[in-house]
Amino acid sequence: MVAKDYPFYLTVKRANCSLELPPASGPAKDAEEPSNKRVKPLSRVTSLANLIPPVKATPLKRFSQTLQRSISFRSESRPDILAPRPWSRNAAPSSTKRRDSKLWSETFDVCVNQMLTSKEIKRQEAIFELSQGEEDLIEDLKLAKKAYHDPMLKLSIMTEQELNQIFGTLDSLIPLHEELLSQLRDVRKPDGSTEHVGPILVGWLPCLSSYDSYCSNQVAAKALLDHKKQDHRVQDFLQRCLESPFSRKLDLWNFLDIPRSRLVKYPLLLREILRHTPNDNPDQQHLEEAINIIQGIVAEINTKTGESECRYYKERLLYLEEGQKDSLIDSSRVLCCHGELKNNRGVKLHVFLFQEVLVITRAVTHNEQLCYQLYRQPIPVKDLLLEDLQDGEVRLGGSLRGAFSNNERIKNFFRVSFKNGSQSQTHSLQANDTFNKQQWLNCIRQAKETVLCAAGQAGVLDSEGSFLNPTTGSRELQGETKLEQMDQSDSESDCSMDTSEVSLDCEHMEQTDSSCGNSRHGESNV
């Protein structure tokens, strides 16, 4: 299931590599044996590294807390490491690197630190982390442009239009953070301490509204980047960069997703500073105001990003016939969740849960673009029946509770059904693990409850998605009395989901009263 992604950054300390020259004592080797080997001049060796401008190889700042997201973003943000190619060098496996963590107390005069209380030292550490994070962010954004964008444009690996789509407004973000870093350095005293940061943040944070366009573009940017990776030249270039020291084992998308990750971290950073700020400090009021500002900005960008993601996927739905088109899809503004599932025949399906309709599709390529062809008629959420199937209750091929060879049990299935007059559908869908299955169940139940509440129907949903009448206490199945009475046509299907995307989707769902949050994309947008 698609959840919004937030990338994980691992860190290792950068090794100090020094070359020790042998002592000059003793006579030089005069009796060197002559060598008849022909050495190829280095100048004749063409290297991709010569085309990449020099960049400072400093790792990503370690985040104090792991952050999850749903814009995308689904970010989807697990590192998309390319599989090693048979013709590439066999590099020793190594973990993702990040830059060394710098502490305020270790950077500035220890004698001064000893004059401060423990709480004040923690406050200075939090302020320094904010400042250091800005410096690292600026460095990484510049690296993304110099080491990826510019060389790919110069070598015509991608067109300027494609690069503009993938990198979006990244260039415009650099001056914003340079301005904050400059102001934070200006108010830092010679001893390294900072007295007030609240007024600076209150004045600077509103400019983060410009993140709107960058975050809203991430879904389309990620899709285009994934598509371009099928090009051998693009794949080769990105793999070489991944193996180079400057990348710190991070792929291009990690760098492109850094601004979003930084944006959602600001509330945490400011709360940490506020937590160590005394009540009588004038900075406290300004910090509280700054937290309210950034929370409002993040919420607004998250909403707009979700709408952008919803539009993106709606535009890529392919209808086999006019009858498949549904006004509920057209009116949807939020994608609660989506992801790949399998049916009981092992067919991979891509399922979308919009605000009021569930759409089951197959991923296809159309005009060199990844699109989603409707597999069956869209199912209105208000009429959808949901059933959590026990492990072993569904057999591959469609049999229910059948005997399995070698007592093999098929796991992580759930069923969605719908019947309206002569129309009926039943789909057995399989998630790739228990967590993904539960995320799908939660998202569907939340979406149905929201739709029923909006329709003014009092009552609650039970664990299987059936409607309970609070007056009689009886169970009422929407659209049909028994789930088992439904026709089990060849639309029966099992699905497997993308975990990261699902968790983000549900995150977004919990944050929005009107729908489930589709976190990576249904993912939490930011």
Swiss-Prot record:
Keyword Plastid: no
Region of interest (Disordered), ranges: 20-40, 464-502, 507-526
Subcellular location: Cytoplasm
Positions of the DH domain: 122-304
GO MF term list: guanyl-nucleotide exchange factor activity
Residues recorded with modification Phosphoserine: 47, 70
GO terms under biological process: intracellular signal transduction; positive regulation of Rho protein signal transduction
Pfam families reported in the protein's UniProt record: RhoGEF, SOS1_NGEF_PH
GO cellular component assignments: cytosol
Classification via CDD domains: PH_RhoGEF3_XPLN, RhoGEF
Domain PH: 291-449
PROSITE patterns found in the cross-reference section: DH_1 (PS00741), DH_2 (PS50010), PH_DOMAIN (PS50003)
Assembly, per entry: Interacts with RHOA and RHOB.
Role description: Acts as a guanine nucleotide exchange factor (GEF) for RhoA and RhoB GTPases.
Protein name, entry field: Rho guanine nucleotide exchange factor 3
Lineage: Eukaryota, Metazoa, Chordata, Craniata, Vertebrata
